[in-house]
């Protein structure tokens, strides 16, 4: 079905579990730089930011992109375990319900989830991996949602595949200062592509993968 607008729904699911300790300033700086760059681009966009450890908290809930404030150390502090599956499941459920009940002409033409984690799921209690996989596959097939998965200290490609995310939409990264910088520099391109009504390149994560392989 042809959409009646060129609105982009952006959903960032960011790991803030204890293993991210020491990368707080890099994460905050990279996030803010990416947002400021996107504010200069054309196209209407709503943005949600979900932070997760052993539980999820919503930092931004579908705010217009140009109204996203800078992230601070008060917003992003690390703690706890890694309830990745629950964070993804909650976010899909929330955004899906909003799209279900708004006027058809107001449903964003494009929806992009960007998921970053530096470890294996170890604290889910709401959703199973199989349930989230079915949710992701449904949103992809029925509504054309896109999902990018960026993981450290795990096999990101295999983990993404277990969630129903295509292998060419997943990439491994190093959870250190340099790797975090490369991550945020790289993800601007697929965001921009969606906002311009273009397809995300299958090589969107090449710079991240190159850094990972170079320092493996």
Predicted region positions:
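Acidic, low-complexity intrinsically disordered regions
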Residues: 1-216
């Amino acid at each position: 079905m042809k959409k009646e607008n060129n609105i982009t729904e952006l959903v960032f699911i960011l790991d803030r579990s204890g293993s991210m300790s020491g990368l707080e300033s890099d994460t905050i700086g990279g996030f803010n730089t990416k947002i400021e760059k996107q504010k200069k681009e054309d196209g209407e966009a709503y943005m949600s930011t979900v932070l997760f450890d052993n539980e999820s908290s919503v930092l931004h809930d579908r705010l217009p992109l140009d109204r996203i404030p800078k992230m601070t150390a008060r917003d992003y502090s690390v703690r706890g375990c890694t309830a990745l599956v629950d964070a993804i499941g909650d976010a899909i459920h929330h955004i899906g319900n909003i799209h279900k009940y708004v006027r058809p002409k107001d449903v964003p033409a494009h929806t992009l989830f960007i998921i970053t984690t530096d470890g294996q799921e170890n604290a889910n209690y709401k959703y199973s991996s199989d349930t989230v996989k079915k949710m992701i596959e449904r949103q992809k097939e029925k509504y054309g949602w896109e999902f990018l998965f960026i993981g450290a200290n795990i096999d990101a490609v295999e983990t993404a595949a277990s969630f129903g995310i295509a292998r060419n939409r997943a990439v491994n990264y190093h959870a250190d200062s340099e790797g975090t910088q490369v991550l945020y520099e790289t993800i601007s391109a697929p965001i921009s592509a969606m906002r311009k009504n273009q397809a995300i390149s299958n090589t969107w994560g090449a710079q991240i993968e190159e850094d990972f392989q170079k320092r493996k």
